């Protein structure tokens, strides 16, 4: 997949919603900084307040160990989903990853629920027919190698378009207006994955799927394939910036 010719997006203000320190935007943040985007990060799990989404041109919603349904124990999720719903239904571009795609689905009225088994591993996803004609996913290979590390899944929101799927989980990526969500990770470095292996919720899903002795080989495999996956992630994210975020800014102005 070829990246678009990079250009400055210095007029763009992006809001990054982060749910745990070890799940930053990774290569997506690299792209934002390279393109001159002004980045405002909110570490929601640390109690940082949510700003007014109207002050931003795009939102990036990252992953985390919590469920999109944990409203009782994490009441800030209610406000976050309200922000996402208002922003997306108003046409603001959004990019959601793992928990981020689940929060996007929930904010659009879809059900988020535990899957039959955690999906953990370096696993392929297939671009759908709609994905092959999508402005962001059209130039992607038909099959992508991705890092999967999740236990919950979601129903496709009404009005959304499925862009990618896998044998285990039908909904791997979707588009709703200018909002895109992906269940998988393409932003992660080997170092980030090693940090994830210290998070209790992630350790549990890792043990259930790969066994107690499976972690070292899994982390070594991520280390080996991280650069290739990050290049794919970079290309998709740049396509979203250039074909969704930038045109939306031109329309808004």
Briefly describe each language-model feature range.
Residues 108-192:
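Pocket-forming structural segment of enzyme catalytic cores
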Residues 186-222:
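C-terminal helical/coil "lid" or tail adjacent to the Rossmann-like core of SAM-dependent
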Residues 31-34, 75-79, 112-113, 164-165, ...:
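Glycine-rich, phosphate-binding/catalytic loops in enzymes
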Residues 1-90, 207-253:
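N-terminal beta1-alpha1 cap of cysteine-dependent amidohydrolase-like domains
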Residues 26, 74, 128-135, 199:
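Serine-centered coil/turn micro-motif
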Residues 15, 40-42, 60, 95, ...:
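Hydrophobic/aromatic beta-strand patches that form the interior of the parallel beta-sheet core
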Residues 61-131:
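Cysteine-nucleophile active-site neighborhood
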Residues 25-27, 70-72, 105-107, 157-158, ...:
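Short glycine-/acidic-enriched loop or helix-start segments at secondary-structure transitions
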């Amino acid at each position: 997949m070829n990246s678009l010719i990079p250009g400055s997006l210095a007029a763009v203000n992006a809001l990054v919603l982060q749910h745990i320190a070890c799940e930053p935007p990774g290569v997506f943040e690299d792209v934002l900084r390279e393109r001159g985007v002004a980045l405002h990060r909110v570490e929601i799990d640390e109690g940082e307040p949510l700003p007014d989404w109207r002050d931003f041109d795009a939102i990036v919603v990252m992953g985390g160990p919590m469920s999109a349904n944990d409203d009782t124990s994490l009441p800030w999720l209610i406000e976050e989903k309200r922000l996402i719903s208002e922003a997306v239904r108003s046409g603001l571009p959004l990019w959601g990853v793992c928990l981020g795609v689940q929060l996007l689905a929930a904010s659009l009225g879809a059900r988020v629920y535990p899957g039959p088994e955690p999906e953990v591993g370096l696993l392929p996803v297939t671009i759908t027919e709609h994905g092959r004609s999508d402005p962001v996913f059209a130039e992607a290979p038909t099959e992508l190698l991705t890092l999967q590390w999740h236990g919950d899944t979601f129903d496709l929101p009404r009005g959304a378009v499925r862009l990618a799927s896998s044998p285990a989980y039908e909904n791997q990526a979707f588009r709703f207006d200018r909002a895109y969500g992906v269940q998988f990770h393409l932003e992660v470095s080997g170092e980030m994955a090693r940090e994830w292996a210290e998070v209790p919720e992630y350790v549990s899903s890792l043990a259930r799927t790969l066994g107690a002795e499976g972690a070292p080989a899994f982390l070594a495999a991520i280390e080996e394939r991280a650069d290739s996956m990050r290049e794919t992630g970079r290309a998709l994210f740049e396509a979203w910036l250039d074909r969704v975020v930038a045109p939306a800014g031109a329309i808004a102005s």
